[in-house]
Amino acid sequence: MDIVGGQNLRQMWDDLAEVYGNKTALIFESSEGVVRQFSYASLNEEINRTANLFLASGIQKGDNVALHLDNCPEFFFCWFGLAKIGAIMVPINARLLREESAWILQNSRAQLIVTSAEFYPMYRQILLEDDTLLNHICLIGENAPVEDNVSHFSQLKDQQPATLCYAPPLSTDDTAEILFTSGTTSRPKGVVITHYNLRFAGYYSSWQCALREDDVYLTVMPAFHIDCQCTAAMAAFSAGSTFVLIEKYSARAFWGQVRKYRATVTECIPMMIRTLMVQPASPEERQHCLREVMFYLNLSVQEKDAFIARFGVRLLTSYGMTETIVGIIGDRPGDKRRWPSIGRPGFCYEADIRDEQNRSLPAGEIGEICIKGVPGKTIFKEYYARPEATAKALEANGWLHTGDSGYRDEEGFFYFVDRRCNMIKRGGENVSCIELENIISAHPKIQDIVVIGIHDSIRDEAIKAFVVLNEGETLTEEEFFAFCEQNMAKFKVPSFLEIRNDLPRNCSGKIIKKNLK
């Protein structure tokens, strides 16, 4: 089923501007409460100006451009502006530190980055000292320094015409984005996402929550994540709805924002639900227009029931990952919901439960959740410059191995059991155990290290590190946590430390993590 045809992202925005004109497309609220608003026509003009900015900066079709931004309208100007000229967005998690960000720049081969003044010192240091191709920094915000290799985004953009200066030939098979995501290996892999992927995501996700043009979709999720991009933004724009982007999540402010913008659809992760539940009760907390709350794993039955009863909402479960682009298993519009099932496969997808020999398992038996789609169309195209990793995860016939375990019942409802090996889910972020272990093992006093996820009532999982010290060494908690804070993003820093004489291992030398829980 081809529901996209030949419509690339450039054609999408030109059509949206023509069809919806002055209808509100994007509302952005900053952490200070400052609101910026754009119609479909004015947003398309901002996108065109940004595309022209990139053209004037020497960016051509096929070039990779990095974005390191918190939620802001400029993220969307850049995302779609790059797509209009056939260039490729490489979003970087705004919480990453220097070493992690430099690694993504190096492996994406991006020569230009758009970032905010907050992150300028880090990228100036990367430009001068690290082995990357980065040669230009474009800064968003006031007081950009007057230095070589630095430009001011708003000044340059506002000088550009509102119509596109050059429109290279585009195909829906062209790459629009490379999104680096944590994996079970020590480093992130770049998920290659095409124009077709993003157009399909818009149609699919708008179908999933039955979006209409009179809907208002509000999200607090970070724009550099796949769920904000494909479950929320692309869905809202494809349906002609209004998309409300909040700069940062605040449990105290959330329901006021939902009421203020008369949001009809939003999305939540467990950390949000738990922090909302501990807020003081308010007589206004049920006075909202929400008809659907898109929900992503994992929540107990008691937590789910309490949240629904208190706030008068219903949860629409959706299961997916960056590689699947959208929530390929979930509750369908008008379908019955069978908690704790994650739902059934959506249109254009097949799902199966496989054993270790890649054989299909019958209902009730636990195995690996596998998804069948079309690479570059309904699922990701490949891992960037990683053919071996691509071949391991993605079969030639389109079956994707998620690494997650689950089962299905006799009626075809699927159930999630456990996360992929060596991953920790922390407040909406995926954290690779191996990546943390490699960083921590560089400490001169540490001989052996393993990290695990342990239950956290607020943020899904906390991170606990078990270390074995070199003989004769001592290590304080202050020393350990200071080392971690200097070498990894804040959300990756372990919450707990246990120093042991040894770590449990099996006969092949692998650490037995279950013995540590």
From Swiss-Prot:
E.C. number(s) listed in UniProt: 6.2.1.48
Domain of life assignment: Bacteria
Keywords from the named record: Ligase
GO molecular function (one): crotonobetaine-CoA ligase activity
Record-linked CDD domains: FACL_DitJ_like
Listed Pfam families: AMP-binding (PF00501), AMP-binding_C (PF13193)
GO process terms (BP): carnitine metabolic process; fatty acid metabolic process
Reaction(s) catalysed (UniProt annotation): 4-(trimethylamino)butanoate + ATP + CoA = 4-(trimethylamino)butanoyl-CoA + AMP + diphosphate; crotonobetaine + ATP + CoA = crotonobetainyl-CoA + AMP + diphosphate; (R)-carnitine + ATP + CoA = (R)-carnitinyl-CoA + AMP + diphosphate
Pathway this chain belongs to: Amine and polyamine metabolism; carnitine metabolism
Family the UniProt entry places it in: Belongs to the ATP-dependent AMP-binding enzyme family.
Role according to the record: Catalyzes the transfer of CoA to carnitine, generating the initial carnitinyl-CoA needed for the CaiB reaction cycle. Also has activity toward crotonobetaine and gamma-butyrobetaine.
Classification via NCBIfam families: PRK08008.1
Protein name per UniProt: Crotonobetaine/carnitine--CoA ligase
